[in-house]
């Protein structure tokens, strides 16, 4: 909230805007304390529920699944970041040289009613440390960092949570991130700078995060690493707030430049800048209390000739910053809730679907385990039946097995046609040779039946190997389909899946051999030239009519009725008989070979596989072995169940939120 000039003029040492005040701090009058307790009073009814909602979702672990609205605090080392957080929270945080914040620290501030006692809690991993005094905070956080990141200067991306409840803090949640460093010092890892930047980027790149960039007033803001990192992930500055610190260290004569930065005239950010003056190292050595530091800050800005205007604009002091951050966080949460609700719903649905793939937990009881295996095998057999009947459920852009087989059978029909067409030239030459060289006592127009048989046999024989190729192709397609069913049902049970694949391979080999025998037998039978008389007559009549129509189309009725020479007429007669028989052979072979393949490679393959799977149930001793899972399957199932429970609880909390 930007305070009006009149509002700011009323701000004095006795009537500060509400700010955090550490319990037990001396030197502040009762009127001042009453004034300090007014922080966010105008928001109180809606502020706490909003922040509590997000904090509760974060405590559930929902942040493992999706991003939550947050304010992340970043800054270079020695930027004054810790001092700002101390001023906001009223507790002393770890200080020192080098990397002090070694784990992300979630600082949850909760405003209590006047008279209630200060409470604190530090949480990390499965450890909770209750605190009864603000002075215990620093040691508890250092202990937590040593536990998570190890004793030394290493860092970790695991969270430490600090809950502070007091009448003298704002309702606010911040995430403090390690200070940016460039050079490894002492026993720090050589790539410590890169590690810290990666950790910071993981937080500030999320669209749900407001980035609070802390920069000393006495440096060139355009060259600071923290602002540069924020600009990379938020180039328009839509979710970045700049905080200038250490205004008392600004060189004389450069104050106007600092004022220009705060007024957003140098590096533009849509959310703008604030400026604060917190305790410095000398103040700490002189044991200046946080409450006294707030009074000292108020005096500094009120009496400073250049910075006074920033106080009047509501852009200076920790109290104004606390109020601004609370307002920003609440606004950000309210804007994010609809999207967050949808994300939780979608994540819940996708997690449920993924959990279904892993199935239920394996029972411990042997009888129940047998029933579990029966259910699994029945489900597998039902899926196989659905494939054989062409009723399996497929995903978008996928096709059923029968669609794939139909395509292969269509190509087979085309292969027969292509084969006959390709043999026409050779056929003409052979018939011509017979007519000119080998015709015996036959009158013109009579075909030598032996020659007719030989021609037909040779042409049909050339189709045998293409039929074998189709058989192998279809077998592979069916094998792949059945293997997919096994993976779908048994992928988590490696022994059962392996046993199924072994059975599948044995039956495939057996059925492919049977199908090959049957196909070769069919081609042997095709060497017998035979067709029912009435069928052959119809085929011959059809060929003659088609040729007559074609002749009439080409040369007209008069030409077609003219007598042809005896040689041409005889050749035509032979070709008509050959074409008539080839058409009937085409019809037989194009249908019968796919029938053989479907019978052996689909129907019998499926039946034998299903029977083989049921036979597994006869050996009850192998039940546990067959149901042995991959080492990570039960862990994955447990993880998904926990996520599902988290998301379900999050949905319930969002549903209860008054909005």
Curated annotation (Swiss-Prot):
SMART domains given in the database record: DYNc (SM00053), GED (SM00302)
Subcellular location: Cytoplasm
Record domain GED: where: 571-659
Any GO CC annotation of this UniProt entry: nuclear pore
Keyword Nucleotide-binding in annotation: yes
Residues annotated to bind GTP: 75-82, 176-180, 245-248
UniProt region (G3 motif), positions on chain: 176-179
Inducing or repressing factors: By type I and type III interferons.
Family annotation (InterPro entries): Dynamin, Dynamin_GTPase, Dynamin_GTPase_CS, Dynamin_N, Dynamin_stalk, G_DYNAMIN_dom, GED, GED_dom
Chain intervals for the UniProt region annotation (G1 motif): 75-82
Stored Gene3D superfamilies: Dynamin, middle domain, P-loop containing nucleotide triphosphate hydrolases
Keywords assigned by UniProt, alphabetized: Antiviral defense, Cytoplasm, GTP-binding, Immunity, Innate immunity, Nucleotide-binding
Annotated region (Disordered), positions in chain: 547-567
Segments of this protein annotated with the region G2 motif: 100-102
Function in brief: Interferon-induced dynamin-like GTPase with antiviral activity against vesicular stomatitis virus (VSV).
Family according to the record: Belongs to the TRAFAC class dynamin-like GTPase superfamily. Dynamin/Fzo/YdjA family.
Protein name: Interferon-induced GTP-binding protein Mx2
Species this chain originates from: Rattus norvegicus
This protein's encoding gene: Mx2
């Amino acid at each position: 909230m930007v305070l009006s000039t009149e509002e700011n003029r009323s701000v004095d040492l006795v009537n500060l805007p509400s700010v955090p005040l550490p319990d037990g701090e001396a030197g502040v009058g009762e009127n001042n304390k009453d004034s300090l307790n007014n922080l966010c009073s105008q928001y109180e009814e809606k502020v706490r529920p909003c922040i509590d909602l997000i904090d509760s979702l974060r405590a559930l672990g929902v942040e493992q699944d999706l991003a939550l609205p947050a304010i992340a605090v970043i800054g270079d080392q020695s930027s004054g970041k810790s001092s700002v957080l101390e001023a906001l929270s009223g507790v002393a945080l770890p200080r020192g040289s080098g990397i002090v914040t070694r784990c992300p620290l979630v600082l949850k501030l909760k405003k209590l009613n006047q008279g209630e006692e200060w409470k604190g809690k530090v949480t990390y991993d499965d450890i909770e440390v209750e605190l009864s005094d603000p002075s215990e905070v620093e040691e508890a956080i250092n202990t937590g960092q040593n536990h998570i990141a190890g004793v030394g200067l290493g860092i970790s991306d695991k969270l430490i949570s600090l809950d502070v409840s007091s009448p003298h803090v704002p309702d606010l949640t911040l995430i403090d991130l390690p200070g940016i460093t460039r050079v490894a010092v002492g026993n720090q890892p050589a790539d410590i700078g890169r590690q810290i930047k990666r950790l910071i980027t993981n937080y500030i790149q999320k669209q749900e995060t407001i980035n609070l960039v802390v920069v000393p007033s006495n440096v060139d803001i355009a060259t600071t690493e923290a602002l540069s990192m924020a600009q990379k992930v938020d180039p328009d500055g839509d979710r970045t707030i700049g905080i200038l610190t250490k205004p008392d260290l600004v060189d004389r004569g450069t104050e106007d430049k600092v004022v220009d930065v705060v007024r957003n005239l140098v590096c533009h950010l849509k959310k703008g800048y604030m400026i604060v003056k917190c305790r410095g190292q000398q103040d700490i050595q002189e044991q200046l209390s946080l409450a006294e530091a707030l009074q000292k800050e108020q005096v500094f800005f009120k009496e400073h000739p250049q910075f006074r205007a920033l106080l009047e604009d509501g852009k200076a002091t920790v109290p104004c910053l606390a109020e601004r951050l609370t307002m920003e966080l609440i606004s950000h949460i309210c804007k994010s809730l609809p999207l967050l609700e949808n994300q939780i719903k979608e994540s819940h649905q996708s997690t449920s679907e993924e959990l279904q793939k892993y199935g239920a937990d394996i029972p411990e009881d042997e009888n129940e385990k047998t029933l579990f295996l029966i259910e699994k095998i029945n489900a597998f057999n039902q899926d196989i039946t659905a494939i054989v009947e062409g009723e399996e459920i497929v995903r978008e852009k996928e096709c059923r097995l029968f669609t794939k087989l139909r395509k292969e059978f269509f190509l087979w029909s085309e292969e027969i046609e292509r084969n006959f067409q390709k043999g026409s030239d050779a056929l003409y030459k052979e018939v011509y040779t017979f007519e000119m060289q080998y015709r015996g006592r036959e009158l013109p127009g009579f075909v030598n039946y032996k020659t007719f048989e030989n021609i037909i046999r040779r042409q049909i024989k050339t189709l045998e190997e293409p039929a074998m190729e189709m058989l192998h192709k279809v077998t592979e397609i069916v094998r792949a389909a059945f293997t997919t069913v096994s993976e779908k049902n048994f992928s988590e049970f490696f022994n059962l899946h392996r046993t199924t694949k072994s059975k599948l391979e044995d039956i495939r080999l057996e059925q492919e051999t049977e199908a090959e025998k049957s196909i070769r037998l069919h081609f042997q039978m095709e060497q017998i030239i035979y067709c029912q008389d009435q069928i052959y007559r119809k085929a011959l009549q059809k060929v003659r009519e088609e040729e007559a129509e074609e002749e009439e189309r080409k040369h007209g009725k008069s030409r077609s009725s003219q007598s042809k020479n005896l040689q041409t007429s005889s050749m035509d007669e032979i070709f008509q008989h050959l074409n008539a028989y080839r058409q009937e052979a085409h019809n037989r072979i194009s249908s019968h070979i796919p029938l053989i393949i479907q019978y052996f490679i689909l129907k019998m393959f499926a039946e034998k596989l299903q029977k083989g799977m049921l036979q597994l149930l006869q050996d009850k001793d192998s039940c546990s072995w067959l149901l042995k899972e991959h080492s990570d399957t039960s862990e994955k199932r447990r993880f998904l169940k926990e996520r599902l429970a988290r998301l379900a609880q999050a949905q319930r909390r969002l549903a209860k939120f008054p909005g």
